[in-house]
Amino acid sequence: MWLGVDVGSTSTNLVLIGENQEVLDYCYIRTSGNPARAVEEGLEVLKPTMDMAGTAILQTAVTGSGRYLIAKKLGTDQVLDEITAQARAASFLNPDADTVFEIGGQDSKYISVKHGQVVDFEMNKVCAAGTGSFIEEQAGRLGIPLPEIGPMALRAKHPVELGERCTVLMESKIVSELAAGAGKEDLCAGLCRSIVRNYLNRVVVNKKVGQVVCLQGGIIHNEGIVSAFYEMLGDRLRITPYYDVTGAYGAALEA
């Protein structure tokens, strides 16, 4: 068995793969400011699968913002950057992939891939308005449980136009639209569309978007976001299997 670990600021993900690079088990854990504890919790979740397999972990690789800290704790020198890990998983799971869109809790990435190799990439600079944490904050502002944002967005009749704005301006616009009587479903739809526009206009910008675009990251749990991406990309869009743990899967493949 091989283990991949992706330690991010929002979530910590672990993936176990077998000799044919198939996923044996995986888990998605909230980091909650304590990556070491999150990894320990993840290993406990995977322990029954490891015990059942009856074989040891041959190698572990770590990626994510906390990769050096956790690699040291796990006693491995297999460390890789997040761009490489995300591209590796996308290319393995979608061999025709030429573009990867990955949106996480605190950052978002654009990756251009050719024959499985990274040829270009970009990450969000400062604005958080194209990331998962922003949606979570606005869900709290609207008084809506986070899992309900997507379904409510899909029920919208007249999505509110929030435009492409930075975090502060978008928050102000949401408050003013609420005060003006906008429905929460329409606001949810506007929020999802605006997140996608912010990502495309502030991260991708003028970068090449190919014909097979793999969408990855925990934000895909939000159906409203996925729908907004489909509106803009059509049948070029692919939802990568294991989309919320692709960083850890890519690390496992490199282990």
Name what the model sees in each region.
Residues G66, V203-F229, Y243-G247:
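Glycine-rich phosphate-binding loops at beta-strand->alpha-helix junctions
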